[in-house]
């Protein structure tokens, strides 16, 4: 029976007891509601045993201390009162641990996150291993929550208000050396001596609190309630600017710290429990948690049921441009798989190597990586202008121009030069994969692998299967994309696939509003306020106006008139406006451009636009996004995407659809299909059939159905 316990206490001869946490049957430790009584029972036992002179809290898992609280228990909360009780139970247990008269040391190896760090903060001292898997942080904000186990109170008292706010508001994870420098841990040692170091610390007894390590200016600002309020007000302004008021958690985190530092820890904990409960029941946190569960669930899937992925040991990338260089870079850096880049020009190859080197060198400059580690990764990337050294390539990723004839030649070259099982993966952004596979003698090996730019930053890839792509090819490509650190969604073949298809209508509508006289900066601000990371005009400048102009005719030809792009694109290209890449777009670039982004007013003249009065921001955002919602449902209707879940993940990770809304499908459930259909029909009467609601939405409006169960 004792084997089934999570917490086990072992007494040593030297008077130090070891409390080992090891959740049975799970790879990582997470804190669960039912652990409270078990911990309290052990703490009572410790208090009653005078032979115990010190306590070390350690994990029984090889690679993690505690990865956080088990967030599935939050879904069971039916109201704020129940959620508040969860937080308060954590407060009681951690206060009991902190209140022990003997020294308590946390011995940390691996992930120490969320409730795990709060557990460590309740200990009197902390020592962590220097292992690369050891990371400390409070990432609750990423789930629309706040640290509800006393973290908002203990963390600022340990590392200072400014540092604590930075950790809690970003959810960033701290490496061991950084944790030592900021005073979050008392020592960093190799994992082999972690336990003994913690034992020695416990033997030394409780130590006087060290002064918080911080700059003179922060010392001054944190010294009185008046100056502390300057920090809180500044933090609040920055948060509001960043979140546009769409995420309630950051403001509540600031309030918890403010109240606790100004009115004492008891008040702070009370506020923390109240705010935590409010956030647990918020629609924003529900959406973010659903996204977390969806991506976790997706990681277990192969993309093709029953298929076993082949091992990928060598990769070739065709094309040394920005996309090719980025793909080769994530292959070597993240997947640690050798990549050979082929380009017709030495300059292209040089650019690809330089691109990868600069990305790695950033890590060296930030001390996240040694120069030797950088050079070892660079050694995995080789280049060629011919088809040499690729006979044993398992995957060839093609990243050349959007030209069907050129891609046909690439397929034939690869089939001639490589083995019969080599996968040909095209990074096309718009050409149907079936058309590319038409030139193949082994079409079952041809697949789409659509990355988003910049490759090293954008988390999504679309894995596109055409009608005869083999399940093994799909599974191997999905597994390869995951090794690159990507979130892959499997979509079926069709012009624009999923992400670019829903994005095109959004961009077209923004361009239409521009031609109607809406100012560029007003359009961008309206969509940023709605929750997108950047506005549509900024995005078009970044992606390239020429790229947008190339994709639109393909989509119009394959999918119909609703994809017809406004005449703006042709006029812009005639004026040689491609966006940031050539320093000429909707905004000013180059040395003349100031730090604050300024619109290039000459665009209005090029497009013969007469500036009109600003339409209401909400109306602008609605008109741009409503077609995206409609088209996402069409993609599900046509089988382009397999599920609403995949559609939500694709939109959030591919184009930055506001995460707090949960994705297009979850947002439609929030709006209600009948309301959405009525709004679409209203726009249809004003602007034409491009706003006609799709059949599935009309059916859902009549029968009241939803994509997700309540």
UniProtKB/Swiss-Prot annotation:
Residue ranges, annotated region (3-hydroxyacyl-CoA dehydrogenase): 310-710
UniProt keyword Lyase, yes or no: yes
Entry keyword annotation includes Isomerase: yes
Subcellular location: Cytoplasm
One Gene Ontology molecular-function label: 3-hydroxybutyryl-CoA epimerase activity
InterPro entries per the UniProt record, alphabetical: 3-OHacyl-CoA_DH_NAD-bd (IPR006176), 3HC_DH_C (IPR006108), 6-PGluconate_DH-like_C_sf (IPR008927), ClpP/crotonase-like_dom_sf (IPR029045), Enoyl-CoA_hyd/isom_CS (IPR018376), Enoyl-CoA_hydra/iso (IPR001753), FA_oxidation_alpha_subunit (IPR050136), FadJ (IPR012802)
Location of the region described as Enoyl-CoA hydratase in the Swiss-Prot/TrEMBL record: 1-190
Family: In the N-terminal section; belongs to the enoyl-CoA hydratase/isomerase family.
Protein name: Fatty acid oxidation complex subunit alpha
Organism: Shewanella frigidimarina (strain NCIMB 400)
Gene for this chain: fadJ
